[in-house]
Amino acid sequence: VITKAGGSAAYGEWAAKKIKTRAGAQFATGVLGTVIFIDDYFNCLTVGTVMRPVTDKHHISRAKLAYLIDATAAPVCIIAPISSWAVAVGSTMESSGVADGMSTFIQTIPFNLYALLTIVMIIFICWTNLDFGPMAKFEHNAIYNNDLHSNPDHPQDIEEENSRIGNKGKVYDLIIPIVALIIFSILAMLYVGGLFT
């Protein structure tokens, strides 16, 4: 809906004036992925929709965008005390006999090395512009061939995707649906947690 209404394109034009470099676009993706920690699926959908126009402008491959999004989604959610994962893990601990599941969950955050090291790795990759393995092929193709979607071995047709993007939107076409989704997600978590009963 956001893409079809043109909200993503409008945000991309606005953000393009603020974000001037490839590293800046990558850092902005990582920061936004860290800030939206309500749920990992919500994070992926939101950050992908919002940052795709910005990363496209700076010739960052979709593969790297996907990596940046995925590497901030679940790791941030599992260490954020206010997330769907915190509620799930805390309640599972309590059903397993732990007296205070949420308190125990919070105490385990410093020991969640996977999540913490993944976030450190994102910062390192954005800062050093290090690409390796298949990611290096995708990035090379994005930078030198202006092909954000594929590597030279597997070209991809993108006409269908481009036909779905609206271009007459405003930034509020992006902000209003995302803010509404955040508010209703928090209310839904509070409702499921029993706050309103």
Positions of PLM-derived features:
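Membrane-embedded alpha-helical segments and adjacent helix-loop junctions characteristic
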Residues: 1-66
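Membrane-interface elements of multi-pass transporters and channels
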Residues: 5-9, 18, 58, 95-96, ...
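Membrane-interface helix termini and inter-helical loops of multi-pass transporters
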Residues: 11, 99-104, 194-197
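Membrane-water interface of alpha-helical transmembrane segments
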Residues: 23, 108, 112, 167-171
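Alpha-helical transmembrane segments and their helix-start/interface "positive-inside/aromatic belt" motifs
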Residues: 26-30, 63-78, 166-178
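Alpha-helical transmembrane segments and, especially, the helix-loop junctions at the ends
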Residues: 33-52, 62-135
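Long, contiguous bundles of hydrophobic transmembrane helices that form the permeation core
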Residues: 118-197
